[in-house]
Protein backbone atom coordinates (compact mmCIF):
# COMPACT_ATOMS: atom_id res chain seq x y z
CA UNK A 1 0.00 0.00 0.00
CA UNK A 2 1.45 3.36 -0.99
CA UNK A 3 0.33 6.88 -0.35
CA UNK A 4 0.95 10.07 1.56
CA UNK A 5 -0.11 11.05 5.05
CA UNK A 6 -3.46 12.75 5.49
CA UNK A 7 -5.53 13.98 8.43
CA UNK A 8 -9.24 13.91 9.09
CA UNK A 9 -11.09 15.89 11.79
CA UNK A 10 -14.20 14.24 13.24
CA UNK A 11 -16.87 16.31 15.00
CA UNK A 12 -20.27 15.13 16.15
CA UNK A 13 -23.37 16.21 18.05
CA UNK A 14 -22.93 19.98 17.85
CA UNK A 15 -26.54 20.52 18.97
CA UNK A 16 -26.60 24.10 17.70
CA UNK A 17 -29.42 25.87 19.50
CA UNK A 18 -28.72 24.44 22.95
CA UNK A 19 -26.35 26.12 25.44
CA UNK A 20 -23.59 26.99 22.98
CA UNK A 21 -20.06 27.85 24.09
CA UNK A 22 -18.85 30.99 22.23
CA UNK A 23 -15.15 30.21 22.80
CA UNK A 24 -15.37 26.92 20.91
CA UNK A 25 -15.27 28.46 17.44
CA UNK A 26 -12.00 30.44 17.71
CA UNK A 27 -10.38 27.62 19.67
CA UNK A 28 -11.34 25.07 17.04
CA UNK A 29 -10.21 27.33 14.21
CA UNK A 30 -6.79 27.69 15.85
CA UNK A 31 -6.43 23.92 16.24
CA UNK A 32 -7.43 23.34 12.62
CA UNK A 33 -4.77 25.79 11.50
CA UNK A 34 -2.20 23.73 13.42
CA UNK A 35 -3.17 20.25 12.26
CA UNK A 36 -4.33 21.12 8.71
CA UNK A 37 -6.89 18.33 8.13
CA UNK A 38 -7.82 17.41 4.58
CA UNK A 39 -11.49 17.04 5.53
CA UNK A 40 -13.86 17.81 8.42
CA UNK A 41 -16.52 15.19 9.11
CA UNK A 42 -19.68 16.04 11.09
CA UNK A 43 -21.47 12.82 12.03
CA UNK A 44 -24.94 14.11 12.83
CA UNK A 45 -26.97 16.06 15.38
CA UNK A 46 -25.68 19.30 13.95
CA UNK A 47 -28.77 20.97 15.44
CA UNK A 48 -30.77 20.53 18.62
CA UNK A 49 -34.31 20.66 17.23
CA UNK A 50 -33.90 20.49 13.45
CA UNK A 51 -35.12 24.05 12.89
CA UNK A 52 -34.16 25.96 9.72
CA UNK A 53 -32.28 28.68 11.59
CA UNK A 54 -30.33 26.07 13.56
CA UNK A 55 -29.34 24.27 10.36
CA UNK A 56 -28.19 27.56 8.86
CA UNK A 57 -26.08 28.44 11.90
CA UNK A 58 -24.54 24.97 12.05
CA UNK A 59 -23.64 25.05 8.35
CA UNK A 60 -22.20 28.57 8.64
CA UNK A 61 -20.06 27.49 11.59
CA UNK A 62 -18.69 24.38 9.89
CA UNK A 63 -17.96 26.18 6.63
CA UNK A 64 -16.23 29.00 8.49
CA UNK A 65 -13.53 26.53 9.55
CA UNK A 66 -11.98 26.78 6.11
CA UNK A 67 -11.83 23.10 5.15
CA UNK A 68 -14.08 20.82 3.08
CA UNK A 69 -16.94 19.47 5.21
CA UNK A 70 -18.83 16.18 4.89
CA UNK A 71 -21.98 16.02 7.02
CA UNK A 72 -24.61 13.35 7.66
CA UNK A 73 -27.85 13.87 9.62
CA UNK A 74 -28.60 12.75 13.17
CA UNK A 75 -31.90 12.11 14.92
CA UNK A 76 -31.96 15.72 16.18
CA UNK A 77 -31.63 17.10 12.64
CA UNK A 78 -35.21 16.31 11.60
CA UNK A 79 -38.39 18.18 12.62
CA UNK A 80 -39.95 17.43 15.98
CA UNK A 81 -43.49 18.30 14.86
CA UNK A 82 -45.24 15.07 13.77
CA UNK A 83 -46.45 16.08 10.30
CA UNK A 84 -43.20 17.71 9.19
CA UNK A 85 -41.21 14.84 10.67
CA UNK A 86 -42.73 12.46 8.12
CA UNK A 87 -43.43 14.75 5.16
CA UNK A 88 -40.36 17.03 5.18
CA UNK A 89 -37.96 14.81 7.09
CA UNK A 90 -34.64 16.00 5.66
CA UNK A 91 -35.74 19.19 3.88
CA UNK A 92 -33.84 21.62 6.11
CA UNK A 93 -30.73 19.44 6.26
CA UNK A 94 -30.66 19.01 2.47
CA UNK A 95 -31.20 22.73 1.96
CA UNK A 96 -27.76 23.25 3.51
CA UNK A 97 -25.93 20.07 2.45
CA UNK A 98 -27.79 18.94 -0.74
CA UNK A 99 -27.71 15.25 0.24
CA UNK A 100 -27.92 13.04 3.32
CA UNK A 101 -25.38 10.57 1.89
CA UNK A 102 -22.39 12.57 0.65
CA UNK A 103 -19.19 11.26 -0.93
CA UNK A 104 -15.67 12.66 -0.70
CA UNK A 105 -12.65 11.27 -2.50
CA UNK A 106 -9.00 12.04 -3.13
CA UNK A 107 -5.86 9.96 -3.62
CA UNK A 108 -5.47 9.72 0.18
CA UNK A 109 -9.07 9.59 1.39
CA UNK A 110 -12.38 8.08 0.26
CA UNK A 111 -15.39 8.79 2.49
CA UNK A 112 -18.96 7.52 2.13
CA UNK A 113 -21.73 9.05 4.26
CA UNK A 114 -24.77 6.95 5.23
CA UNK A 115 -28.08 8.23 6.60
CA UNK A 116 -29.03 6.13 9.65
CA UNK A 117 -31.95 8.36 10.76
CA UNK A 118 -35.45 6.90 10.71
CA UNK A 119 -38.31 9.36 11.46
CA UNK A 120 -40.43 6.75 13.24
CA UNK A 121 -37.59 6.08 15.70
CA UNK A 122 -36.85 8.79 18.24
CA UNK A 123 -33.38 7.57 19.25
CA UNK A 124 -32.26 4.44 17.43
CA UNK A 125 -31.38 4.23 13.75
CA UNK A 126 -30.91 1.75 10.94
CA UNK A 127 -29.15 1.08 7.65
CA UNK A 128 -30.99 -0.64 4.78
CA UNK A 129 -29.46 -3.27 2.52
CA UNK A 130 -29.53 -0.93 -0.48
CA UNK A 131 -27.51 1.59 1.55
CA UNK A 132 -24.89 -1.05 2.29
CA UNK A 133 -24.72 -1.87 -1.41
CA UNK A 134 -24.40 1.85 -2.17
CA UNK A 135 -21.46 2.08 0.24
CA UNK A 136 -19.80 -1.00 -1.25
CA UNK A 137 -20.10 0.35 -4.79
CA UNK A 138 -18.49 3.65 -3.85
CA UNK A 139 -15.74 2.13 -1.71
CA UNK A 140 -14.83 -0.07 -4.68
CA UNK A 141 -14.01 3.11 -6.60
CA UNK A 142 -11.44 4.30 -4.03
CA UNK A 143 -7.84 4.85 -5.03
CA UNK A 144 -5.59 1.99 -3.93
CA UNK A 145 -3.75 4.27 -1.50
CA UNK A 146 -6.87 5.89 -0.02
CA UNK A 147 -8.13 5.37 3.52
CA UNK A 148 -11.66 4.01 3.10
CA UNK A 149 -14.08 5.60 5.56
CA UNK A 150 -17.81 5.19 6.24
CA UNK A 151 -19.72 7.74 8.34
CA UNK A 152 -23.13 7.47 9.99
CA UNK A 153 -24.73 9.00 13.08
CA UNK A 154 -25.79 5.98 15.11
CA UNK A 155 -23.05 3.98 16.80
CA UNK A 156 -21.92 0.41 16.15
CA UNK A 157 -20.00 0.25 19.42
CA UNK A 158 -20.27 2.41 22.52
CA UNK A 159 -18.58 3.34 25.75
CA UNK A 160 -19.39 0.58 28.29
CA UNK A 161 -20.68 3.10 30.83
CA UNK A 162 -23.24 4.39 28.31
CA UNK A 163 -24.79 1.11 27.20
CA UNK A 164 -28.42 2.24 27.52
CA UNK A 165 -28.47 3.95 24.11
CA UNK A 166 -29.24 1.37 21.46
CA UNK A 167 -26.73 1.01 18.61
CA UNK A 168 -27.74 0.99 14.98
CA UNK A 169 -30.22 -1.77 14.15
CA UNK A 170 -28.69 -5.10 13.00
CA UNK A 171 -25.26 -3.79 13.88
CA UNK A 172 -23.45 -7.12 13.40
CA UNK A 173 -24.83 -7.37 9.86
CA UNK A 174 -24.03 -3.72 9.14
CA UNK A 175 -20.47 -4.07 10.45
CA UNK A 176 -19.83 -7.28 8.51
CA UNK A 177 -21.15 -5.75 5.28
CA UNK A 178 -19.03 -2.61 5.63
CA UNK A 179 -15.92 -4.63 6.44
CA UNK A 180 -16.55 -6.86 3.42
CA UNK A 181 -16.92 -3.70 1.33
CA UNK A 182 -13.43 -2.62 2.37
CA UNK A 183 -14.14 0.00 5.03
CA UNK A 184 -11.02 0.62 7.14
CA UNK A 185 -12.59 3.23 9.42
CA UNK A 186 -16.24 3.50 10.50
CA UNK A 187 -17.25 6.73 12.24
CA UNK A 188 -20.31 7.71 14.27
CA UNK A 189 -21.51 9.86 17.17
CA UNK A 190 -24.84 9.88 19.04
CA UNK A 191 -23.67 8.86 22.53
CA UNK A 192 -21.65 12.03 23.30
CA UNK A 193 -18.62 10.07 24.49
CA UNK A 194 -15.46 8.86 22.80
CA UNK A 195 -15.09 5.17 22.08
CA UNK A 196 -12.92 3.30 19.62
CA UNK A 197 -11.88 -0.26 18.94
CA UNK A 198 -10.38 -2.46 16.27
CA UNK A 199 -12.97 -5.06 15.25
CA UNK A 200 -10.84 -7.98 16.48
CA UNK A 201 -10.99 -6.51 20.00
CA UNK A 202 -14.74 -7.11 20.29
CA UNK A 203 -15.57 -9.67 17.59
CA UNK A 204 -14.29 -13.19 16.96
CA UNK A 205 -13.37 -13.40 13.28
CA UNK A 206 -11.94 -16.71 12.08
CA UNK A 207 -9.27 -16.75 9.36
CA UNK A 208 -9.80 -13.07 8.61
CA UNK A 209 -7.11 -10.52 9.30
CA UNK A 210 -8.60 -7.42 7.72
CA UNK A 211 -8.39 -4.54 10.17
CA UNK A 212 -11.29 -2.14 10.63
CA UNK A 213 -11.33 0.60 13.25
CA UNK A 214 -14.69 1.70 14.66
CA UNK A 215 -14.72 5.11 16.36
CA UNK A 216 -17.26 7.33 18.12
CA UNK A 217 -16.58 11.05 18.52
CA UNK A 218 -17.47 12.79 21.79
CA UNK A 219 -20.06 15.53 21.38
CA UNK A 220 -19.07 19.08 20.54
CA UNK A 221 -22.27 20.44 22.09
CA UNK A 222 -22.92 21.31 25.72
CA UNK A 223 -22.43 18.30 28.05
CA UNK A 224 -25.58 17.37 29.90
CA UNK A 225 -25.09 17.49 33.69
CA UNK A 226 -27.36 14.48 34.27
CA UNK A 227 -25.21 12.27 32.02
CA UNK A 228 -22.09 10.89 33.68
CA UNK A 229 -18.80 11.28 31.88
CA UNK A 230 -19.73 13.62 29.06
CA UNK A 231 -17.21 16.17 27.81
CA UNK A 232 -16.86 18.37 24.74
CA UNK A 233 -14.42 16.75 22.39
CA UNK A 234 -13.41 15.62 18.92
CA UNK A 235 -11.16 13.09 17.20
CA UNK A 236 -8.34 13.59 14.71
CA UNK A 237 -7.27 10.69 12.50
CA UNK A 238 -3.82 10.63 10.93
CA UNK A 239 -3.54 8.09 8.14
CA UNK A 240 -0.23 6.82 6.81
CA UNK A 241 0.40 3.90 4.43
CA UNK A 242 0.53 1.24 7.17
CA UNK A 243 -0.94 2.90 10.27
CA UNK A 244 -3.91 4.91 11.50
CA UNK A 245 -3.37 7.08 14.57
CA UNK A 246 -6.34 8.53 16.48
CA UNK A 247 -5.90 11.61 18.68
CA UNK A 248 -8.63 12.53 21.18
CA UNK A 249 -8.97 16.23 22.01
CA UNK A 250 -11.13 17.53 24.87
CA UNK A 251 -12.24 21.12 25.49
CA UNK A 252 -10.85 22.37 28.81
CA UNK A 253 -12.78 25.60 29.49
CA UNK A 254 -10.62 27.80 27.26
CA UNK A 255 -8.60 25.57 24.91
CA UNK A 256 -8.33 22.12 23.35
CA UNK A 257 -6.20 19.55 25.16
CA UNK A 258 -4.83 16.29 23.78
CA UNK A 259 -5.92 13.50 26.14
CA UNK A 260 -5.30 10.20 24.34
CA UNK A 261 -3.58 8.59 21.36
CA UNK A 262 -4.30 5.17 19.88
CA UNK A 263 -2.58 3.54 16.93
CA UNK A 264 -4.07 0.90 14.62
CA UNK A 265 -2.69 -1.06 11.66
CA UNK A 266 -4.07 -0.51 8.17
CA UNK A 267 -4.81 -3.25 5.68
CA UNK A 268 -3.98 -6.92 6.08
CA UNK A 269 -0.38 -6.63 7.26
CA UNK A 270 0.17 -7.16 11.01
CA UNK A 271 1.51 -4.12 12.82
CA UNK A 272 5.13 -4.58 13.89
CA UNK A 273 5.90 -3.97 17.58
CA UNK A 274 6.87 -0.37 18.12
CA UNK A 275 7.00 1.91 21.12
CA UNK A 276 4.56 4.82 21.00
CA UNK A 277 4.71 7.88 23.30
CA UNK A 278 1.85 8.08 25.78
CA UNK A 279 1.00 11.57 24.61
CA UNK A 280 2.38 13.30 21.57
CA UNK A 281 1.00 16.47 20.00
CA UNK A 282 0.41 16.36 16.26
CA UNK A 283 3.12 17.99 14.21
CA UNK A 284 2.30 21.49 13.03
CA UNK A 285 3.46 20.63 9.54
CA UNK A 286 0.82 19.69 6.99
CA UNK A 287 0.31 16.29 5.41
Which residue ranges define each predicted feature?
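Active-site environment of divalent metal-dependent phosphoester hydrolases
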Residues: 17-19, 48-53, 57, 75-83, ...
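Extended active-site neighborhood of metal-dependent phosphoesterases/phosphodiesterases
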Residues: 56-137, 177-179, 208, 236
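Short acidic, glycine-rich surface-loop motifs adjacent to enzyme active sites
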Residues: 144-159
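Active-site neighborhood of phospho(di)ester-bond hydrolases with catalytic His/Asp-centered motifs
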Residues: 11-12, 39-45, 69-75, 115, ...
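Conserved beta-sheet core of the metallophosphoesterase superfamily
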Residues: 164-240
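A short C-terminal boundary segment appended to hydrolase-like catalytic domains
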Residues: 238-287
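Beta-strand-turn-beta hairpins that frame and shape the catalytic cleft
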Residues: 1-9, 103-113, 143-147, 209-212, ...
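N-terminal active-site segment of His-dependent metallophosphoesterases
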Residues: 1-64, 80-81, 99, 134, ...
Amino acid sequence: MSGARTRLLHLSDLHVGSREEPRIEPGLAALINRIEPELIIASGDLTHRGRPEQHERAADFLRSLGRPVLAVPGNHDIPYTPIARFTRTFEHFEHQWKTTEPIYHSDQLHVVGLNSVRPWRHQSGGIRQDQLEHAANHLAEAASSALRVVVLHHHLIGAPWRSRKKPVSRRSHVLAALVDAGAELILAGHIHQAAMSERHEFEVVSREVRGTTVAIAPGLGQPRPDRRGEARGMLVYESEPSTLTVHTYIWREDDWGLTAIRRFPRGREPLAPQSTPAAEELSTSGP
